[in-house]
Structures are given as C-alpha cells and as structure tokens.
C-alpha cells in the first residue's frame, strides 16, 4: 500500500485564527492525508524546522492577519536556503488576501493560494493531485537533519510494504545490536510515556526537554511522538501544537501515525529508535 501524503499545517506568527485551519485539517484527514499540525503563532523558523524534520511533501499556511506576502515568501526562501526546496508551500485565508497578492506569492514560489469560498473538496483534490505522486529521486541531503528525516521516511515507507515470501526485511535495531551504528551512544536515555488522551504526556515531555537542554548546553534530544491511525486513512499528528520548549535546533522531533498497528506504537518505531541512537535522550 502506498504511504499516505504527509503535509504540515500552521498559522503564522501574531495570528491566532485557527478555526479555519482546524476544519481543513479534519477534511484532509478524512481523505487519507497525514497532517502534522504545528498550531498558531508560529515563526518562519519554527515552520521550516518542523517541515524538514517531518519530511512533509508540503506546508499549508492559513493567514488572516495580513503580512502574508512576506511571510509565505520567507518560508519558501528559508526552505531553499536549508536545501529543502522539494518541500512546497500553499496557503489561503480570508478577505485580507487579494488576487493581486496571490499572483505576487506565486511569483515568489508559492504553489497555490485558496480564497474565501473555496470548497474543501477543491483543496483536498489539489493536495492529492499535486503532492500524491511518488517523489522524484532526491539529491544528497545538505544537512544532517534532512538526511535523518529522509532515512526515517524510508523506514516508515518500508514498513508499509508487504515483504516478499520467505524474506524478512532487515531491522535497524538488529544492526544496532551488531554494532553497525558507530555513532550510537551507550549512555543514551530512552524514556517512554503512555496514558489516555489529555493526561498531559506532551506537556510533561516538553518540560523535560527544557530541563535536559538547560542542564547540558551541548545535549541533543529526539522525540518520537505517536498518534493513532487506521490503515488507508489519515491522521492528525498534533503534539507539536502544544510544545513550546521543543522548538529548538537541538531537538529533533518526528510525528508518527500508528498506521493500523495496535498498542500505541508505529510499525517503524523500533527501527526509528535505532536511527536516533546518537542522541543524548530519546522520548
């Protein structure tokens, strides 16, 4: 089965209008799209960092407070600067965005702008048609975060495919046990959190991240955040929306859908853990 389309959605800094993007998120999910939701009042740097780490196909930005031309153009510019020009940008908003504004944003590299009155079906169709095709062969990653994000995607995609008869796909965990991951740290802390929805898991993790970063100014932290999903359906991966301290260049966070596996973990979790073994702490 083909892997779901992954996109990131967000609301720009100094903008708290999130009702529209929440409605759109739910429609995307209903049509099999995995949505990493970053929340509102997010800076260009936060959005680009998250998009790279999540290895999404595109970023959808909902803007209602003005400044959209400069903001979306800066997102495109920073993606290119970081070597992630394959991540595309689209957006929309209310009456603050004119057709003239949309023309300017397209010239600056934005794929599409949706106006008030655009149907949800039209937005879903656009995402499926524009970002649902297989990725082209990607050039060598220009940063360690991009390289890591690509490898995590490869692991997740491989877990979604059925192995050929009488074959067993190699596990990154097996390689770690055999000493094939020379960058792994024997003292890496791996901490798991579980509990019902609303128990405060994300808040606790975010507070621990703050303390780990403050205790050791050189430490690096990784987070594998899980949300339930059914095979063939989308998922709302929204833990980033409530995290404050984890918006840091020393924190690598990946949002994972369970993709039909029971128990709260993704089929790719164990192999992804092995790939992150060079971090000081993994949560």
Give the ranges of each region predicted by the language model.
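Extreme N-terminal, non-catalytic leader segments
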Residues: 121-177, 182-190
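ATP-binding Walker
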Residues: 15, 196-199
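Cofactor-cradling patches in redox/metallo enzymes
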Residues: 14, 21-125
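Nucleotide-state-sensitive switch-loop elements of NTP-binding domains
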Residues: 156-162, 186-188, 199, 208-283
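Hydrophobic positions on the alpha1 helix immediately C-terminal to the Walker A/P-loop
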Residues: 204
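The Walker A (P-loop) glycine that initiates the GxxxxGKT/S ATP-binding motif of P-loop NTPases
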Residues: 11, 195, 255
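Non-catalytic signal-transmission and effector/linker regions of two-component phosphorelay proteins
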Residues: 1-5
